[in-house]
Structures are given as structure tokens and as C-alpha cells.
């Protein structure tokens, strides 16, 4: 498992009406490789509103259609739920993800 990888998660939450949802791993690699049982992820929705806290992803990343990563809705998921690999972000998309996460968390460079 690596930062920037996308996974389809079955029944991610009782509040989520979808049977499955794609998430991108945003935790730092040291945490991913540690004994911690969870990682921080951002959900992928088909909606993309152009907010500074969202980045566009699409079929090149393994998705069925154009979508958006929503960095305002970070969640902690057990690593054991992240088994259905979909694809991964390009280096350019990872840079955009970093910017969107900084905006969502109001971090300054």
C-alpha cells in the first residue's frame, strides 16, 4: 500500500448510501508501513465542484468516469478494508493532492 493509491471499499460507512466507494490513501508512507491499523483517506465522488480542496481524477487513474477527490471529508479507515486496488495517482496529481490537503487543513507552506 502506498500514498496516492485508490481502493474501492465495500460498505465504507452506515451513513454512506453507496454499496462501495473509492478512497485515496493520503497518510504519509511511514504511517502506512507502521503497525498502526488505520490510514487517513479521502473519498472520491463523481461530483467535482472545482473547489480548492478537490482534485479531478478520471479513467486514467482506474476509475469508471471523471470524479473528484474531496479533501474536506478525510476519514480514517482500517488497512484491512483497503484490498480492492483501483489505481494510483500520477506524480502531478499527487502534487495537486498535497495542495488540496494544505487548503483543507489550512496549513501554510
Model-derived regions: residue spans:
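Conserved functional hotspots at enzyme active or ligand-binding sites that engage polyanionic ligands
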Residues: 1-109
Amino acid at each position: 500500500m502506498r500514498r496516492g493509491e485508490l481502493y474501492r471499499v465495500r460498505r465504507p460507512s452506515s451513513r454512506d448510501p453507496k454499496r462501495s466507494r473509492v478512497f485515496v490513501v493520503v497518510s504519509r508512507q511511514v504511517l502506512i508501513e507502521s503497525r498502526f491499523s488505520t490510514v487517513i483517506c479521502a473519498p472520491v465522488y463523481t461530483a467535482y465542484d472545482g473547489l480548492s480542496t478537490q482534485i479531478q481524477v478520471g479513467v486514467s487513474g482506474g476509475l469508471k468516469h471523471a470524479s473528484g477527490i474531496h479533501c474536506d471529508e478525510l476519514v480514517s479507515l482500517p488497512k484491512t478494508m483497503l484490498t480492492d486496488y483501483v489505481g494510483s495517482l500520477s506524480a502531478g496529481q499527487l502534487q495537486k493532492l498535497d495542495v488540496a490537503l494544505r487548503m483543507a487543513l489550512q496549513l501554510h507552506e
